[in-house]
C-alpha cells in the first residue's frame, strides 16, 4: 500500500489550488489544521473506520465536528475525501498544504541548532544571508544542543548544512575507518 503522504498529495494539491484561486490560503490552512486535529482523536478514528457508516454519513459527521468554521468549498472537499475513504489523511493533507502555501508565499522555516547561545546581531545576519541564498523569506528558529560541541546545524526544508564540530568529527572518523 502507498504511503499516506503519497495518497494525500493530490488532495493537498487540489485544496491548495482551490484556496489559491479563491485567495483564501489562510482560511483553508486554518480549516485543514483543525480537520487534522479532529482526525487525530481516537473516537473520530473509530468513527472514520466504522464499516457501518456510509461515506455520506462520515462526511456529515466530520463536517458537524468542524462546526461553523467551514465554507461550502471546504465542506465539499471533506465530502470528496469521504467518498474516496481518505478522511484519515487530513494530517498529511494539512502538512502538504502548508508546504505548498509556504512555497507560494516564498517562505521557509529554518531551524538553527548551535552548541551555544548566538548573539541577535549574528542571527539577523544569518537570516539575511539565508534569505538571499534560498530566495525565500526565512523564519529562523533556534535551539541549543551542547552535544554539537561547536559550530551549527542548519535545516531548511530538506536541506541540511552540518557545520558542527560533532559532524566534522564523525566525518573524520568515517574517513579514517576506510
Curated annotation (Swiss-Prot):
A cellular component term, taken from the record's GO annotations: plasma membrane
What is the membrane topology listed in the Swiss-Prot or TrEMBL record? Peripheral membrane protein
List the GO molecular function terms.
proton-transporting ATP synthase activity, rotational mechanism
What domain of life does the native source organism fall in? Bacteria
UniProt keywords, alphabetically: ATP synthesis, Cell inner membrane, Cell membrane, CF(1), Hydrogen ion transport, Ion transport, Membrane, Transport
Q: Where in the cell is it found?
A: Cell inner membrane
Q: What is its main location?
A: membrane
Listed HAMAP family: ATP_synth_delta_bact
Assembly, in brief, is:
F-type ATPases have 2 components, F(1) - the catalytic core - and F(0) - the membrane proton channel. F(1) has five subunits: alpha(3), beta(3), gamma(1), delta(1), epsilon(1). F(0) has three main subunits: a(1), b(2) and c(10-14). The alpha and beta chains form an alternating ring which encloses part of the gamma chain. F(1) is attached to F(0) by a central stalk formed by the gamma and epsilon chains, while a peripheral stalk is formed by the delta and b chains.
The protein's job, in short, is: F(1)F(0) ATP synthase produces ATP from ADP in the presence of a proton or sodium gradient. F-type ATPases consist of two structural domains, F(1) containing the extramembraneous catalytic core and F(0) containing the membrane proton channel, linked together by a central stalk and a peripheral stalk. During catalysis, ATP synthesis in the catalytic domain of F(1) is coupled via a rotary mechanism of the central stalk subunits to proton translocation. This protein is part of the stalk that links CF(0) to CF(1). It either transmits conformational changes from CF(0) to CF(1) or is implicated in proton conduction.
Belongs to which family? Belongs to the ATPase delta chain family.
Full protein name: ATP synthase subunit delta
What is the native source organism of this protein? Teredinibacter turnerae (strain ATCC 39867 / T7901)
Gene that encodes it: atpH
Amino acid at each position: 500500500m502507498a504511503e499516506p503522504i503519497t495518497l494525500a498529495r493530490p488532495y493537498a494539491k487540489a485544496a491548495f489550488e482551490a484556496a489559491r484561486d479563491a485567495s483564501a490560503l489562510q482560511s483553508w490552512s486554518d480549516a485543514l489544521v483543525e480537520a487534522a486535529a479532529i482526525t487525530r482523536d481516537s473516537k473520530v478514528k473509530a468513527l472514520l473506520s466504522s464499516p457501518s457508516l456510509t461515506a455520506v454519513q462520515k462526511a456529515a459527521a466530520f463536517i458537524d465536528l468542524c462546526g461553523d468554521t467551514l465554507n461550502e468549498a471546504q465542506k465539499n472537499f471533506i465530502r470528496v475525501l469521504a467518498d474516496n475513504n481518505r478522511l484519515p489523511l487530513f494530517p498529511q493533507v494539512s502538512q502538504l498544504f502548508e508546504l505548498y502555501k509556504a512555497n507560494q508565499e516564498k517562505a521557509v522555516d529554518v531551524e538553527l541548532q548551535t552548541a551555544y547561545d548566538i548573539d541577535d546581531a549574528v542571527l539577523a545576519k544569518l537570516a539575511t544571508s539565508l534569505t538571499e541564498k534560498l530566495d525565500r523569506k526565512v523564519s529562523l528558529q533556534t535551539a541549543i544542543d551542547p552535544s554539537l560541541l561547536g559550530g551549527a546545524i542548519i535545516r531548511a526544508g530538506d536541506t541540511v548544512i552540518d557545520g558542527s564540530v560533532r559532524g566534522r568529527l564523525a566525518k573524520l572518523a568515517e574517513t579514517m575507518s576506510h
